[in-house]
């Protein structure tokens, strides 16, 4: 997939990566992909860790509130985590609600968010999506955030 923003157009955007570390090894792989994509684009970033995917939207909201109160302003956000289906309905709740909350934040606050929260049936599927040499969803989420930053600037939002 081709993204719409070159390194020059970005003017060194500053992003916040919010990673859920429920599965540490998978989190490392997703973060590695996201960092590599942002480094390649010349972007800067901070990383904050949260317990699980449901905490990611709230953390982004905290960052937005903090910026309003003189804290760090971010041009965009990258959400990373893994939700693997188990034996209960919990998978559906976490998957649906984390995605819905990220979409709501993106639309209501007019912010750029790359969603790299994997929602998979098993660990094998997660690894295929997390590894840089495979689907590199961490890198994809970072590049998506950069694209949305570019579009936001293009439209003057």
Swiss-Prot record:
A GO term for molecular function: 6,7-dimethyl-8-ribityllumazine synthase activity
Top-level taxon: Bacteria
Keyword ATP-binding listed: no
Pathway stated in the Swiss-Prot or TrEMBL entry: Cofactor biosynthesis; riboflavin biosynthesis; riboflavin from 2-hydroxy-3-oxobutyl phosphate and 5-amino-6-(D-ribitylamino)uracil: step 1/2
Positions with a binding annotation for (2S)-2-hydroxy-3-oxobutyl phosphate: 87-88, 129
Gene3D superfamilies per record: Lumazine/riboflavin synthase
Pfam name, any one: DMRL_synthase
GO biological-process terms attached to the record: riboflavin biosynthetic process
EC id: 2.5.1.78
Binding, 5-amino-6-(D-ribitylamino)uracil: 22, 53-55, 82-84, 115
Stated induction or repression of this protein's expression: The two ribH genes may be differentially expressed during the Brucella infection cycle. Brucella would use RibH1 for flavin biosynthesis during the extracellular phase and RibH2 during intracellular growth.
Positions of the catalytic residues: 90
Catalytic activity: (2S)-2-hydroxy-3-oxobutyl phosphate + 5-amino-6-(D-ribitylamino)uracil = 6,7-dimethyl-8-(1-D-ribityl)lumazine + phosphate + 2 H2O + H(+)
Cellular component GO terms, alphabetical: cytosol; riboflavin synthase complex
Keywords (A to Z) from UniProt: Riboflavin biosynthesis, Transferase
Subunit structure: Homopentamer.
Function: Catalyzes the formation of 6,7-dimethyl-8-ribityllumazine by condensation of 5-amino-6-(D-ribitylamino)uracil with 3,4-dihydroxy-2-butanone 4-phosphate. This is the penultimate step in the biosynthesis of riboflavin.
HAMAP family given in the database record: Lumazine_synth
Family classification: Belongs to the DMRL synthase family.
Protein's name in the database: 6,7-dimethyl-8-ribityllumazine synthase 1
């Amino acid at each position: 997939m081709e993204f719409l923003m070159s390194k020059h157009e970005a003017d060194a955007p500053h992003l916040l990566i919010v990673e859920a570390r429920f599965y540490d090894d998978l989190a490392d792989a997703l973060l590695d992909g996201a960092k590599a994509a942002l480094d390649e684009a010349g972007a800067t970033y901070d990383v904050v860790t949260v317990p699980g995917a449901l905490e990611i939207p709230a953390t982004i909201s905290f960052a937005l509130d903090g910026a309003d109160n003189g804290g760090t302003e971010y041009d965009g956000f990258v959400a990373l985590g893994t939700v693997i289906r188990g034996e209960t309905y919990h998978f559906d709740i976490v998957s649906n609600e984390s995605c819905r909350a990220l979409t709501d934040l993106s639309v209501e606050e007019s912010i750029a968010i790359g969603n790299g929260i994997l929602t998979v049936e098993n660990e094998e599927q997660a690894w295929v999506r997390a590894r840089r040499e495979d689907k590199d969803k961490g890198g994809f989420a970072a590049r998506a955030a950069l694209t949305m930053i570019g579009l936001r600037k293009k439209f003057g939002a």
